Amino acid sequence: MPREPILIVDDNPVNLKLVRVLLAGAGYDARTASDAEEALEVLREFRPKLILMDIQLPGMDGLELTRRLKANPETRGIVVLALTAYAMKGDDKRTLEAGCDGYISKPVDTRTLPATIEQYLSRDATHGGRET
């Protein structure tokens, strides 16, 4: 049985491929987008349960995209985990204020990423999604 659909949004092609291959190997239906506009295009046809969102994207950044997704009744229930290479003080607060459900620092720990994703998906299923 296939696992949950996931969208990975990152402007670094190496990161996109690494995470997609890792998640596909764990049984997830993983799709990718290299910027916010492409992510919005993918979301017209693909409804992920979770988005791994790079917060530093060209054009519209990942936090603004998250705000838009959480403001839209059709996409607000998608779990969004922020990805950033800059684990600076205050980043976790900024990502949560934008509507992200969690925060993962880059480089991604390939040993724990599938389990981390499973935890967030299980938590979302238990709570029936966010009501905000």
For each predicted feature, which ranges?
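The feature encodes the CheY-like receiver
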Residues: 16, 58, 76, 88, ...
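Acidic, metal-coordinating helix/loop segments flanking the phosphotransfer/catalytic sites
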Residues: 32-50
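Conserved phosphotransfer cores of two-component systems
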Residues: 44-46, 68-78, 98
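C-terminal output helix
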Residues: 96, 108-117
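Charged docking surfaces used in two-component/phosphorelay signaling
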Residues: 17-25
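Active-site residues of response regulator receiver
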Residues: 54, 84
